[in-house]
Amino acid sequence: MAEITAALVKELRERTGEGMMDCKKALTKAGGDIEKAIDDMRASGAIKAAKKAGNVAAEGAIAIKDDGKAAVIIEVNSQTDFLALQDDFKNFVAASVEKAFADKLTDVAPLIEAQETARLVLVGKVGENVNIRRLKRIEGDVVGSYLHGNKIGVVVTLKGGNVELAKDIAMHVAASNPEFLFPSEVSAEAIEREKSVFLQLNEDKIKGKPAEIVEKMVGGRITKFLAEASLVEQAFVKNPEIKVGDLAKKAGAEIVSFTYFKVGEGIEKPVDNFADEVAAQLAAAKQ
């Protein structure tokens, strides 16, 4: 029996896309013979699913489960938007968020582990990669959520108020995507960058103007920037006459937090060359 070295495990992982522990188990069972391990994994159906792990999954869905006091929000990715609309994928997402909520999970790793068998079955059936990407559990005095087409999900927590108010504010967050809750959370560096950009863009307008006038112009831009970036300072989408922060105060509530998930956020999608894609399809058709 050949020694099961880290290098051997790494090679099998690179060739199959399977996890380190699964590769080690397969090599042990195969007596250290990597080719036999691959054959065994193919026979079990594991590789058919895992080989697709190299494909970028940047589409998918956001799902939320809440009960007014707690919520779980997850992102599950697929390679194509078409799959994200299919019942098999939707059922997997629904089962995953139910599991996460029922088990009060606060980290995505246990959910990935718990759903791995179901994921492999799904991948083997649909022929493309599927990943549970992230999860967050939120608890509070009042918790409300909003889903926009399963592509954007928001959870808002309040101190005071009610679930309907939290849902309204969550809907606003989905539409406006604020960076911060309060203006005080905006870093000095961000403000300085905004000042610098403003001065560069308006170089001709401020040339020759007194320093105090320039200062007022910059101050006006920063005030607008803070209003655009901070949830409590934004005009409420349902009634632009009132700020979101004032809306909450009027209802005797305080906004404690918001969580915003968007499908594919931060995932680098491959840019396909259309000509190459057509050429590849024509070549495949001739075989």
Curated annotation (Swiss-Prot):
Keyword Cell inner membrane part of the UniProt annotation: no
Chief localisation class: cytoplasm
Compartment list: Cytoplasm
Region span, Involved in Mg(2+) ion dislocation from EF-Tu: 80-83
Domain of life: Bacteria
Keywords, ordered alphabetically: Cytoplasm, Elongation factor, Protein biosynthesis
A molecular-function term among this protein's GO annotations: translation elongation factor activity
Keyword Iron on entry: no
UniProt xrefs under PROSITE patterns: EF_TS_1, EF_TS_2
Gene3D superfamilies found in the cross-reference section: 1.10.286.20, DNA helicase RuvA subunit, C-terminal domain (1.10.8.10), Elongation factor Ts, dimerisation domain (3.30.479.20)
CC terms in the record's Gene Ontology section: cytoplasm
Pfam families given in the database record: EF_TS
HAMAP family, per the entry: EF_Ts (MF_00050)
Function: Associates with the EF-Tu.GDP complex and induces the exchange of GDP to GTP. It remains bound to the aminoacyl-tRNA.EF-Tu.GTP complex up to the GTP hydrolysis stage on the ribosome.
Family (UniProt): Belongs to the EF-Ts family.
Name listed for the protein in its UniProt record: Elongation factor Ts
Native species: Pseudomonas syringae pv. tomato (strain ATCC BAA-871 / DC3000)
